[in-house]
A protein has these predicted regions:
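Chalcogenol-based redox active-site neighborhoods
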Residues: 1-126
Length: 126
């Protein structure tokens, strides 16, 4: 977990939900927003499944207030095949994710953020 007041760490990752944000998303593409929520989620996690609909509603409500949201999945597809980029794209489409859903294949971004489990949320102001 990052220290309170830390700046958001830079990233550039492929987007499995390209209708929202394009084929890849970086921190720089989100800079025009006054606040940023980085959410580490995945398809198979029962906690993520439980909050999924509420999270989508939350994002729809707060993006109108200037909150940018990006979700990142950093699971290894060998151990979690339901979290593959193809399955992520299906999930984003099926549940109408209104945010980029990024794939962190190397887990470098998750490690840099010290994301420990899913869901794990990091909120930043500018």
């Amino acid at each position: 977990m990052e220290e309170l007041g830390s700046p958001a760490l830079d990233f550039s990752l492929p987007n499995t939900n390209p209708g929202v944000g394009g084929p890849s998303v970086s921190l720089n593409t989100l800079n025009e927003h006054p606040a940023l929520l980085v959410a580490f989620i995945c398809n198979h996690c029962p906690y993520v499944i439980h909050i999924r609909d509420s999270f989508v509603s939350f994002v729809l409500d707060y993006r109108e207030k200037g909150l940018a949201v990006v979700a990142i999945c950093a699971n290894d597809v060998r151990t979690h095949p339901d979290d593959s980029p193809e399955k992520m794209a299906e999930e984003a489409s099926k549940f109408g994710y209104p945010f980029p859903y990024l794939y962190d294949e190397s887990q470098a971004v998750a490690k840099a953020y010290r994301a420990a489990c899913t869901p794990d949320f990091f909120l930043y102001n500018r």
